[in-house]
Structure formats: C-alpha cells, structure tokens
Amino acid sequence: MPSELRSPRLAVLIDADNASAKIADGLFEEIAKIGEASVRRIYGDFSNARSRGWADILSKHAIIPQQQFAYTTGKNASDITLVIDAMDLLHSGRFDGFCLVSSDSDFTRLAARIREQGVDVFGFGEQKTPESFRQACRRFVYTENLLAAPATTQDAAARSTSLQPPDAATPIIKKVITQMESEDGWVALGEVGRQLANLASDFDPRTFGFRKLSDLVRKTNSFEIDESKGRAMRIRVKPAAAAPPRRRNPRRPARAGAAGGSAPKA
C-alpha cells in the first residue's frame, strides 16, 4: 500500500510586537494552504498592550508563547530569541519551510539565510513592510488581506483605504505576459499567476479587492480573455487602439492680387 503524501512541515514564528492578534484566524487559514504548521511560536513581552491581545487566543491556535521582558530600552530581546530559535530549527533539518510573521525589516537577513539553505520562507506582514524583507521571502502575504469581514464602519473604511485600484496591477501583469513570449500573445492564466509569484513575492489579487486573479484581470479591462470550452482560461494584452486620422484644415483661397502685389493704376 503506497504511503500517504506528507504535507510540507512548517515552522511558524510570530513577532508579537509587529503583528496584530486580529489576523490570527486568517493567518492560520492561509498557512494551512501551504502545509502543516508543526511548530507555532510567538515572541514578545506579553505584559505590554501591543502583545497582550495575543494572550487571549494562544490556546485556540496552539501557539507556544516565548515571553521576553524588555529589561533595556532600545534592545529587542524578542527579535534575538526568534532568530536563535529559527536557526536551531533550521539546522534540525525537520522543516520544509518557515513562516515569519512580522513587518520588521530586521528579519531580512534571517529570511535570506534560511533560503540559502534551500528552505522556503513565507512572510506575513503589513503593507508598510520594507521591500527588502518582502523580496527576501519566496512569497509575502499582506496581513490586511487576512482580516475577517469588517465588523464596523470604521473597520470597513480602514480596509478600503488599504486596497489598491485594479489598474495598479495592469503593468506587472503585462510585463509577465511579455516575458512569456507567446507567439500569438495568448498565455494560460494559471501560468501567469505562477510567474507573477516568481516576479513579485507580494503579488496578491486580494490587495486589489479580488479573491481570484481572473476577476482582477476582467476588472482592469486591459486584456482579451479566451474561455473556450474544454480549455483553461487564456489572456493576452489588448492591442493599442489605432490613433484617429489627423484632420487637415482646408486651405483658404488666396486673395486677389495677394500674390502679385498691387495692381497698376490705369
């Protein structure tokens, strides 16, 4: 009897000082799409207001807290402990990937070091996260996209503010299609999605208000779509509209005598 395929084993390390407890449900739902969260640890000083919100949901998600008291101002013991644990877990050889939950660029080198070892890194942080950390991850998910449906008008307004307009996605989608160099311009949407993830680790249709890439592509109105029966959806860039013919102003007839000067007097 063939053995059952094992899900990728993941180590989830959360920086409580730079991640809101509101994302917890969405975070672990997203991680479940990647693999099994075998290790779940959170680092912070749970006596302060920022980290205290996590204390109420630790048991719900089986997260092991690593309490770090702030003995000295300006020194982040939580970050140091997280990095030490990450390296210990990496060298154990037991994990297929790491999920680093933080908006702090201090973890850029950690992410790069883990990937140098041939292990995937999935980052989770706010849209303000510096590009250096986002690009150090194989994939980066904005935590604004993990929040539950807004419960209040204020939450809805905040969510709306974090969304980017659909047209903002057009340039990078066009770039991917161009790079794929299809003879007739048509490319499979699924392949476009994979190439987008390779080109920009933080690309996510949810950032533009859509759960599916296909819905985002339709909304931009910048691509032709082929949904022929029995085949995967394909797209290509709409050809540029031809410029309207230039109107030429009719020439006015020359006035009598204008060309030859004044007529001689009789």
PLM feature spans:
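Short gly/pro/ser/thr-enriched loop/turn and capping motifs at secondary-structure boundaries
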Residues: T73-K75, K128-S132, L147-P150
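Short, glycine/polar-rich helix-capping loops at beta-to-alpha or helix-loop-helix junctions
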Residues: R50-A55, G125-R134
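Domain-level signal for Mg2+-assisted phosphodiester chemistry and nucleotide/NA-binding surfaces
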Residues: M1-H91, D120
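N-terminal regulatory modules in eukaryotic regulatory proteins
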Residues: A156-A266
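P-loop/Walker A NTP-binding module and the surrounding RecA-like catalytic core of P-loop NTPases
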Residues: A16, A21, R40, T108-A112, ...
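Conserved phosphate-handling catalytic cores of large alpha/beta enzymes
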Residues: F122, R134-A151
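Acidic beta-strand-to-loop metal/phosphate-binding motif
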Residues: L13, Y43, D96-S103, L110, ...
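Short, structured coil segments at secondary-structure junctions
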Residues: H61, Q117, Q135-C137
